[in-house]
Each structure stands twice: as structure tokens, then as C-alpha cells.
């Protein structure tokens, strides 16, 4: 298994009323090879409300481990990697209900060796909430564009036992241009020239910009890692 681990923290409107913690473990078979079981998380990982991803070295498998306990962070993903240490942004910390929660959140991060903090959040957001000002189709276009550029492979949708959350998994290759402006132009060109997007672009002129906004953290994430492949996730809230 790769040493890359991606924690994706989710926040949903309703939590179980029982005292039992809800936990599911599964493995996603990407290319039909033998599945690789996901190792159990380390100490205090159950303090997080999130999902742990681990990929094999050749990126043929992605392991998914979903833990739900309490919503420490809202609309935020954290990355934990031997060479990268992330922290919540001040604005996201301010969203927590109390200073006690903020202190607890930082203590949990420190317990996972996240000592060197950097202001970086890989935030793809919730489909339902972004849909208030972002066309839902933008998510599908994002995956399609990455595939056309040869930068990633969509694994389709994976539904957690939590009925409120869907996930769209993506294996992203590190073969991305060094200059983001050039990369953005390639994406914009695909959106502008493909007839399939013509009607959608005419209805939503800002669609290109909205898609590019989702690509920025993906690009930054790639260039902060030495890994050849990066497991990505887009959290989507189920439409009511």
C-alpha cells in the first residue's frame, strides 16, 4: 500500500441517535485485479468523522474506510502525509461551536503528528450545497475533463451506508503541466469546443470558471506530493 492517506471529513444534517459509533470498511476494486484489504487505522483515528483512503503503489486499488463519530470540521478535507502536514484554516475553525471544540480539534491533529502546520485545505465541497450556486453538472464535467486530458480515471459513484452522502472517486495521475495557466487553458478549450457542453455553457457562462475553481486544489495537491498517483474524492450530498 502507498504511504499516502487522505482524510475526508464530512458533515451531515442528521446523526444516529444511538450511542453506537457507525463504522464501515470496504475496498474498491479499480481495475479488476485482486482486491487489497485496507489496514485498520491507527490510534485515535476514530476521533475523526471521515474517510480514509489508501492506494496501492501502482494505483490499481483504492481502499475506503469510513468513520463517523462527530462533526469536528465542516466542509473540509485534510491530508495526512509524511511530507505534508495540513491544518484547518482559521475561518473553518471559527465555524466550530466553541473554543473547547477548536482545542480538541488541534489536539487530535497533533496526536497524528501534524506538527508542521500549513494553511491548505483541499475542499471539493458538497454537491447539494454547491448546487445552490453551482450547476450540478459541473462535477460531472470536472471528471470528464480530467479523463479527456489523460489526468485521471473516474471510478464512478460509491455510496456510504450513511444515506445522506455519496462519493465520486477519482484516481488522478501526476502527469499535469507545471504551469497552471496552461493547464487551465486546456480545460477551457475542451469546454468551449465540445458541442455537448454548448447548451450548458450558454445557460451558465460562469461554468468554465466554476470547473477551474475545482481544479485548483487538485493541481496544488499534485505538486506538493512525490507520488505518481493520488486518490481523490468528491463528496456529494444526496438530493432530497
Name each model-derived stretch.
Residues 1-240:
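ER/Golgi luminal nucleotide-sugar-dependent glycosyltransferases, focusing on the catalytic module
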Amino acid at each position: 500500500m502507498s504511504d499516502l492517506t487522505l482524510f475526508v471529513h464530512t458533515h451531515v444534517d442528521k446523526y444516529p441517535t444511538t450511542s453506537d459509533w457507525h463504522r464501515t470498511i470496504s475496498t474498491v476494486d479499480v481495475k479488476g485485479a485482486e482486491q487489497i484489504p485496507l489496514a485498520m487505522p491507527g490510534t485515535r483515528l476514530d476521533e475523526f468523522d471521515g474517510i480514509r483512503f489508501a492506494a496501492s503503489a501502482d494505483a490499481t486499488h483504492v481502499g475506503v474506510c469510513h468513520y463517523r463519530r462527530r462533526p469536528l470540521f465542516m466542509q473540509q478535507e485534510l491530508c495526512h502525509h509524511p511530507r505534508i502536514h495540513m491544518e484547518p484554516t482559521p475561518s473553518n475553525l471559527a465555524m466550530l461551536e466553541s473554543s473547547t471544540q477548536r482545542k480538541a480539534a488541534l489536539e487530535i491533529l497533533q496526536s497524528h503528528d501534524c506538527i508542521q502546520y500549513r494553511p491548505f485545505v483541499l475542499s471539493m465541497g458538497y454537491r447539494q450545497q454547491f448546487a445552490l450556486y453551482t450547476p450540478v453538472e459541473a462535477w460531472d464535467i470536472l471528471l470528464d475533463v480530467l479523463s479527456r486530458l489523460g489526468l485521471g480515471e473516474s471510478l464512478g459513484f460509491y455510496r456510504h451506508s450513511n444515506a445522506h452522502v455519496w462519493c465520486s472517486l477519482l484516481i488522478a495521475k501526476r502527469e499535469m503541466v507545471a504551469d497552471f495557466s496552461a493547464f487551465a487553458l486546456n480545460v477551457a478549450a475542451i469546454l468551449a469546443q465540445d458541442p455537448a457542453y454548448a447548451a450548458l455553457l450558454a445557460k451558465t457562462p460562469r461554468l468554465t470558471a466554476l470547473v477551474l475553481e475545482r481544479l485548483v486544489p487538485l493541481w496544488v495537491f499534485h505538486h506538493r506530493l512525490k507520488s505518481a498517483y493520488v486518490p481523490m474524492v468528491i463528496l456529494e450530498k444526496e438530493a432530497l
